[in-house]
Amino acid sequence: MSEAPLILLAAGGTGGHLFPAEALGVVLMKRGLRVRLVTDSRAMRYSGLFSADMIDVVPSETVRGRTPWALARTGVMLGAGTALAIGLMMRLRPAAVIGFGGYPTLPPLFAARALRIPTLIHDANAVMGRANRLLSRRVSAIATSLPGVLDRDPELAAKTTTTGTPMRPAILAAAAVPFAPLDAEEPLRLLVVGGSQGARVMADIVPGALDELDPALLRRLALTQQVRDEDMSRVRAVYDRLKIACELAPFFSDLPARLAASQLVVSRSGAGTVAELGAIGRPSILVPLPGALDQDQFANAGVLADAGGAIRIVQGDFTSERLAAEITALAADPQKLTAMATAARTVGRLDAADRLADLVMQVARI
């Protein structure tokens, strides 16, 4: 009896890339296919579905500069990674290779093209990421989370399907939890996160903002905040002084459940975060990561803000005073919070993993 077809999933080693890959993997396995993950060494923290024997680490390199030395180093690392990926694929013989963005996807996708293996890339951002842009003209098909991402390029648009962002089972379970309207007598459940890698700006700004709040509102706060290890002591010192009921950690493995329990989220606006806020339907204050060449987080935050589900604040305007004012205004207007939660949900697509799995099987001719 022959083995089931194998689908190789390639993703950068952060949650924003790995979680959609995991969500697709769950659906493909339910359909009787085999899956493996190709990534970098960072992925073990977020591996989830993928046990160690289902993961292949291939060296890659992020483009970190334009000097001849930096470009040469990048070229050498990508070349070595591609050679290893070719050997891996000749051994595994996948039916298709699916990329989810990040520079670690370049070697396996380059190798797949060299071996004439069908390929597909998925991009969750409102602006396509750089690694996916490098691959876009070389792959068999493209999937995007949002409509219109490639409409300005007829050649790419012709092979693009809008699927949404695949959601892990934990997110789908959280999406079934209804938003709890804010009650003046109950705690305000505030969740502060900075993406899968954390964000120092939250440690710099949020404690000062909470220090600005009216004491009556401060006493109602039930705070959960992602804080990097190096920032933990100074953040905790402020909250201890303010006597805030809080839970602080560098990483929350149960973040979907915490999102579901929240009534207001303060966060960066990576593609995965925005998609999960839409799927679960929670109001948010989003602070896009500044300095990105393509301003993808600014565009991502705009998707939720334009729908009425979020307030977007650029980092230059993200001060303790501004955040305190926004939290105070929202806490005083429970109906607005509920309306934002409803609006956010209009952005989410809960069937995205199945839609992407359909496209994968079409590309792989299964």
Curated annotation (Swiss-Prot):
It is a peripheral membrane protein. GO terms for biological process: carbohydrate metabolic process; cell division; cell wall organization; lipid glycosylation; peptidoglycan biosynthetic process; regulation of cell shape. It is an enzyme of class 2 (transferase). SUPFAM superfamilies: UDP-Glycosyltransferase/glycogen phosphorylase (SSF53756). InterPro entries: GlcNAc_MurG (IPR006009), Glyco_trans_28_C (IPR007235), GlycoTrans_28_N (IPR004276). Belongs to the glycosyltransferase 28 family. MurG subfamily. This is UDP-N-acetylglucosamine--N-acetylmuramyl-(pentapeptide) pyrophosphoryl-undecaprenol N-acetylglucosamine transferase. The gene is murG.
